Amino acid sequence: ESWLVEPQQLDKAGLMWRPGVKVGVKPSSWSHRNEWFGPVLAIIEAPDFDTAITWQNQTDFGLTAGIQSLDEKECEEWINRIQAGNLYVNRGITGAIVNRQPFGGWKRSAVGPNAKAGGLNYVNTLRNWPRVTNLEAAIYGVNTWWAKVGSQAIDRSGLVVEKNFQRYRHYLAPVVVVVDESTTQAEKSLIHHIAETTGAKVIFTTDLSDVSESYSRVRWLASSKPPIYSEMQKGISVDHRPIAQRGDIEAARWLIEQSVAITYHRYGNPNGGPKPICTGLSK
Protein backbone atom coordinates (compact mmCIF):
# COMPACT_ATOMS: atom_id res chain seq x y z
CA GLU A 1 0.00 0.00 0.00
CA SER A 2 1.08 3.57 -0.56
CA TRP A 3 -0.31 7.05 -0.07
CA LEU A 4 -1.55 8.84 -3.16
CA VAL A 5 -2.43 11.69 -0.80
CA GLU A 6 -1.01 11.41 2.71
CA PRO A 7 -3.03 12.87 5.61
CA GLN A 8 -1.47 15.81 7.41
CA GLN A 9 -2.33 17.30 10.79
CA LEU A 10 -3.68 20.83 10.35
CA ASP A 11 -3.96 22.03 13.95
CA LYS A 12 -1.97 21.69 17.16
CA ALA A 13 -4.73 19.77 18.94
CA GLY A 14 -4.81 17.03 16.31
CA LEU A 15 -8.53 17.45 15.64
CA MET A 16 -8.24 18.61 12.02
CA TRP A 17 -6.60 16.53 9.32
CA ARG A 18 -6.22 16.77 5.58
CA PRO A 19 -7.96 13.83 3.81
CA GLY A 20 -5.88 10.90 2.63
CA VAL A 21 -6.10 8.46 -0.28
CA LYS A 22 -4.44 5.03 -0.22
CA VAL A 23 -3.76 2.97 -3.36
CA GLY A 24 -2.54 -0.58 -3.80
CA VAL A 25 -4.83 -1.81 -1.05
CA LYS A 26 -5.32 -5.59 -1.10
CA PRO A 27 -8.51 -7.51 -0.24
CA SER A 28 -8.72 -8.74 3.38
CA SER A 29 -6.03 -6.27 4.46
CA TRP A 30 -6.40 -4.03 7.53
CA SER A 31 -7.31 -1.08 5.33
CA HIS A 32 -10.06 -3.13 3.69
CA ARG A 33 -11.60 -4.79 6.77
CA ASN A 34 -11.49 -1.91 9.27
CA GLU A 35 -13.49 1.27 9.62
CA TRP A 36 -11.45 4.46 9.20
CA PHE A 37 -12.46 7.05 11.80
CA GLY A 38 -11.09 9.83 9.66
CA PRO A 39 -11.20 11.12 6.08
CA VAL A 40 -9.24 8.27 4.46
CA LEU A 41 -10.19 6.55 1.20
CA ALA A 42 -8.63 3.11 0.59
CA ILE A 43 -8.83 2.06 -3.08
CA ILE A 44 -8.89 -1.61 -4.14
CA GLU A 45 -8.73 -2.58 -7.80
CA ALA A 46 -11.09 -5.49 -8.56
CA PRO A 47 -10.74 -7.63 -11.71
CA ASP A 48 -14.50 -7.59 -12.38
CA PHE A 49 -17.85 -6.37 -11.07
CA ASP A 50 -18.78 -9.62 -9.33
CA THR A 51 -15.53 -9.67 -7.38
CA ALA A 52 -15.99 -6.03 -6.40
CA ILE A 53 -19.36 -6.82 -4.81
CA THR A 54 -17.90 -9.83 -3.00
CA TRP A 55 -15.09 -7.73 -1.55
CA GLN A 56 -17.48 -4.95 -0.60
CA ASN A 57 -19.56 -7.44 1.39
CA GLN A 58 -16.53 -8.97 3.14
CA THR A 59 -16.27 -6.28 5.80
CA ASP A 60 -17.84 -6.76 9.23
CA PHE A 61 -19.62 -3.43 8.82
CA GLY A 62 -22.61 -2.39 6.73
CA LEU A 63 -23.77 1.15 7.38
CA THR A 64 -23.73 2.81 3.95
CA ALA A 65 -22.67 1.70 0.47
CA GLY A 66 -22.66 3.42 -2.91
CA ILE A 67 -22.17 2.81 -6.61
CA GLN A 68 -21.61 5.07 -9.62
CA SER A 69 -22.63 3.37 -12.87
CA LEU A 70 -24.52 4.14 -16.08
CA ASP A 71 -25.31 0.45 -16.58
CA GLU A 72 -28.90 -0.10 -15.39
CA LYS A 73 -28.55 -3.88 -14.97
CA GLU A 74 -25.29 -3.42 -13.11
CA CYS A 75 -26.99 -1.04 -10.69
CA GLU A 76 -29.87 -3.48 -10.14
CA GLU A 77 -27.53 -6.39 -9.43
CA TRP A 78 -25.63 -4.25 -6.93
CA ILE A 79 -28.89 -3.19 -5.22
CA ASN A 80 -29.96 -6.82 -4.88
CA ARG A 81 -26.67 -8.13 -3.51
CA ILE A 82 -25.03 -5.49 -1.34
CA GLN A 83 -25.12 -5.95 2.44
CA ALA A 84 -25.67 -2.54 4.00
CA GLY A 85 -28.45 -0.57 5.62
CA ASN A 86 -28.38 2.48 3.35
CA LEU A 87 -27.66 2.15 -0.38
CA TYR A 88 -26.93 5.07 -2.70
CA VAL A 89 -26.96 4.80 -6.49
CA ASN A 90 -25.30 7.54 -8.58
CA ARG A 91 -25.24 10.07 -5.74
CA GLY A 92 -23.25 10.86 -2.60
CA ILE A 93 -23.36 8.40 0.29
CA THR A 94 -23.57 10.97 3.11
CA GLY A 95 -26.26 13.35 4.29
CA ALA A 96 -29.16 10.95 4.89
CA ILE A 97 -32.49 12.78 5.12
CA VAL A 98 -35.05 11.92 7.81
CA ASN A 99 -38.10 10.11 6.40
CA ARG A 100 -36.67 10.13 2.86
CA GLN A 101 -33.70 7.95 3.79
CA PRO A 102 -34.15 6.44 7.28
CA PHE A 103 -30.69 5.66 8.63
CA GLY A 104 -29.25 2.54 10.21
CA GLY A 105 -26.77 -0.20 9.40
CA TRP A 106 -26.35 -3.96 9.15
CA LYS A 107 -23.90 -6.37 10.75
CA ARG A 108 -21.55 -4.65 13.24
CA SER A 109 -22.88 -1.27 12.16
CA ALA A 110 -26.04 -1.96 14.17
CA VAL A 111 -26.96 -3.02 17.69
CA GLY A 112 -30.28 -3.39 19.48
CA PRO A 113 -33.81 -3.37 18.01
CA ASN A 114 -32.48 -2.33 14.56
CA ALA A 115 -35.25 0.09 13.60
CA LYS A 116 -33.90 2.87 11.41
CA ALA A 117 -33.66 6.38 12.84
CA GLY A 118 -36.12 8.60 10.99
CA GLY A 119 -38.18 5.61 9.89
CA LEU A 120 -41.69 4.40 10.62
CA ASN A 121 -40.60 1.76 13.16
CA TYR A 122 -38.29 3.85 15.32
CA VAL A 123 -40.84 5.16 17.83
CA ASN A 124 -42.37 1.67 18.08
CA THR A 125 -39.13 0.37 19.60
CA LEU A 126 -39.50 2.84 22.48
CA ARG A 127 -42.88 1.43 23.51
CA ASN A 128 -43.85 -1.67 25.47
CA TRP A 129 -46.29 -3.82 23.50
CA PRO A 130 -48.68 -6.33 25.12
CA ARG A 131 -47.76 -10.00 24.89
CA VAL A 132 -49.68 -12.04 22.32
CA THR A 133 -52.77 -13.84 23.62
CA ASN A 134 -55.14 -13.70 20.63
CA LEU A 135 -53.28 -15.72 18.00
CA GLU A 136 -55.92 -15.31 15.28
CA ALA A 137 -55.86 -11.51 15.50
CA ALA A 138 -52.05 -11.46 15.52
CA ILE A 139 -51.86 -13.67 12.42
CA TYR A 140 -54.29 -11.36 10.62
CA GLY A 141 -52.02 -8.42 11.49
CA VAL A 142 -48.97 -10.25 10.15
CA ASN A 143 -50.67 -11.13 6.87
CA THR A 144 -51.95 -7.59 6.31
CA TRP A 145 -48.57 -6.04 7.09
CA TRP A 146 -46.72 -8.48 4.82
CA ALA A 147 -49.02 -7.84 1.86
CA LYS A 148 -49.00 -4.04 2.15
CA VAL A 149 -45.59 -3.25 3.64
CA GLY A 150 -43.16 -6.08 4.35
CA SER A 151 -43.00 -7.54 0.85
CA GLN A 152 -42.95 -4.16 -0.90
CA ALA A 153 -40.32 -1.57 -1.85
CA ILE A 154 -42.11 1.68 -0.98
CA ASP A 155 -41.10 5.16 -2.14
CA ARG A 156 -42.79 7.62 0.21
CA SER A 157 -40.91 10.69 -1.04
CA GLY A 158 -42.80 10.99 -4.33
CA LEU A 159 -39.89 12.69 -6.13
CA VAL A 160 -39.33 12.44 -9.89
CA VAL A 161 -35.57 13.04 -9.94
CA GLU A 162 -34.73 10.77 -7.02
CA LYS A 163 -36.29 7.51 -5.83
CA ASN A 164 -36.09 6.69 -2.13
CA PHE A 165 -37.21 3.14 -1.50
CA GLN A 166 -37.73 1.65 1.93
CA ARG A 167 -37.85 -2.12 2.06
CA TYR A 168 -37.15 -5.19 4.18
CA ARG A 169 -34.59 -7.94 3.64
CA HIS A 170 -33.79 -11.23 5.34
CA TYR A 171 -31.09 -11.31 7.99
CA LEU A 172 -27.82 -12.72 6.67
CA ALA A 173 -27.99 -15.60 9.18
CA PRO A 174 -30.83 -17.21 11.16
CA VAL A 175 -32.40 -15.74 14.28
CA VAL A 176 -32.09 -18.07 17.28
CA VAL A 177 -35.16 -18.27 19.53
CA VAL A 178 -34.45 -19.47 23.07
CA VAL A 179 -37.56 -20.91 24.75
CA ASP A 180 -38.49 -22.71 27.96
CA GLU A 181 -41.65 -23.76 29.81
CA SER A 182 -42.62 -20.10 30.31
CA THR A 183 -42.89 -19.51 26.54
CA THR A 184 -46.53 -19.67 25.50
CA GLN A 185 -47.89 -21.71 22.63
CA ALA A 186 -49.29 -18.52 21.11
CA GLU A 187 -45.80 -17.02 21.00
CA LYS A 188 -44.27 -20.07 19.34
CA SER A 189 -47.13 -20.41 16.85
CA LEU A 190 -46.91 -16.76 15.84
CA ILE A 191 -43.16 -17.05 15.25
CA HIS A 192 -43.71 -20.10 13.04
CA HIS A 193 -46.34 -18.20 11.06
CA ILE A 194 -44.09 -15.16 10.59
CA ALA A 195 -41.25 -17.40 9.40
CA GLU A 196 -43.51 -19.21 6.92
CA THR A 197 -45.02 -15.95 5.65
CA THR A 198 -41.86 -13.87 5.28
CA GLY A 199 -39.21 -16.53 4.71
CA ALA A 200 -37.32 -15.50 7.85
CA LYS A 201 -34.83 -18.14 9.00
CA VAL A 202 -35.46 -19.22 12.60
CA ILE A 203 -33.82 -21.76 14.92
CA PHE A 204 -35.60 -22.84 18.12
CA THR A 205 -33.57 -24.06 21.08
CA THR A 206 -33.73 -24.41 24.85
CA ASP A 207 -29.97 -23.91 25.20
CA LEU A 208 -28.06 -21.31 23.20
CA SER A 209 -24.81 -23.23 23.59
CA ASP A 210 -26.31 -26.10 21.57
CA VAL A 211 -26.48 -23.95 18.41
CA SER A 212 -23.47 -24.79 16.23
CA GLU A 213 -24.19 -22.71 13.12
CA SER A 214 -23.70 -18.96 12.90
CA TYR A 215 -26.65 -16.71 13.72
CA SER A 216 -27.46 -13.02 13.39
CA ARG A 217 -29.62 -12.33 16.44
CA VAL A 218 -31.09 -13.97 19.53
CA ARG A 219 -34.74 -13.71 20.56
CA TRP A 220 -34.80 -14.61 24.27
CA LEU A 221 -38.21 -15.90 25.38
CA ALA A 222 -36.96 -17.93 28.36
CA SER A 223 -37.44 -16.90 32.00
CA SER A 224 -33.69 -17.06 32.74
CA LYS A 225 -31.41 -14.04 32.44
CA PRO A 226 -30.49 -13.30 28.79
CA PRO A 227 -26.74 -13.27 27.95
CA ILE A 228 -26.84 -9.74 26.57
CA TYR A 229 -23.24 -8.74 27.22
CA SER A 230 -21.52 -11.98 26.25
CA GLU A 231 -23.39 -12.03 22.94
CA MET A 232 -22.69 -8.35 22.34
CA GLN A 233 -18.98 -9.11 22.49
CA LYS A 234 -19.56 -11.25 19.38
CA GLY A 235 -21.58 -8.53 17.66
CA ILE A 236 -24.89 -10.30 18.36
CA SER A 237 -27.92 -8.44 19.74
CA VAL A 238 -30.25 -10.19 22.19
CA ASP A 239 -33.91 -9.17 22.02
CA HIS A 240 -35.72 -10.19 25.23
CA ARG A 241 -39.04 -8.47 24.53
CA PRO A 242 -42.15 -10.69 24.63
CA ILE A 243 -43.81 -11.57 21.32
CA ALA A 244 -46.19 -8.69 20.61
CA GLN A 245 -49.95 -9.01 20.12
CA ARG A 246 -49.77 -6.53 17.23
CA GLY A 247 -48.89 -8.68 14.22
CA ASP A 248 -47.53 -5.75 12.22
CA ILE A 249 -45.23 -4.71 15.07
CA GLU A 250 -43.94 -8.23 15.65
CA ALA A 251 -43.43 -9.20 11.99
CA ALA A 252 -41.14 -6.23 11.35
CA ARG A 253 -38.79 -7.43 14.09
CA TRP A 254 -37.87 -10.57 12.14
CA LEU A 255 -36.58 -8.73 9.07
CA ILE A 256 -33.96 -6.03 8.58
CA GLU A 257 -34.70 -2.63 7.07
CA GLN A 258 -32.93 -1.16 4.06
CA SER A 259 -33.10 2.31 2.49
CA VAL A 260 -32.23 2.66 -1.21
CA ALA A 261 -31.73 6.13 -2.74
CA ILE A 262 -31.40 6.25 -6.55
CA THR A 263 -30.69 9.31 -8.68
CA TYR A 264 -33.20 9.42 -11.57
CA HIS A 265 -31.65 12.23 -13.58
CA ARG A 266 -28.41 12.96 -15.43
CA TYR A 267 -26.99 16.42 -14.71
CA GLY A 268 -30.50 17.70 -14.04
CA ASN A 269 -32.08 16.04 -17.07
CA PRO A 270 -34.83 13.67 -15.80
CA ASN A 271 -34.81 11.87 -19.17
CA GLY A 272 -31.11 11.02 -18.90
CA GLY A 273 -29.20 8.39 -16.96
CA PRO A 274 -30.14 4.87 -15.89
CA LYS A 275 -33.45 4.12 -14.14
CA PRO A 276 -32.72 0.98 -12.10
CA ILE A 277 -35.62 -0.76 -10.36
CA CYS A 278 -35.66 -1.61 -6.66
CA THR A 279 -37.86 -4.59 -5.78
CA GLY A 280 -39.44 -5.79 -2.56
CA LEU A 281 -38.87 -9.00 -0.62
CA SER A 282 -39.96 -12.48 -1.59
CA LYS A 283 -39.63 -15.71 0.37
Segments from the language model and where they lie:
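Conserved C-terminal structural/oligomerization subdomain of aldehyde/semialdehyde dehydrogenase
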Residues: 9-11, 16-283
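PAS and PAS-like sensory modules
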Residues: 5-6
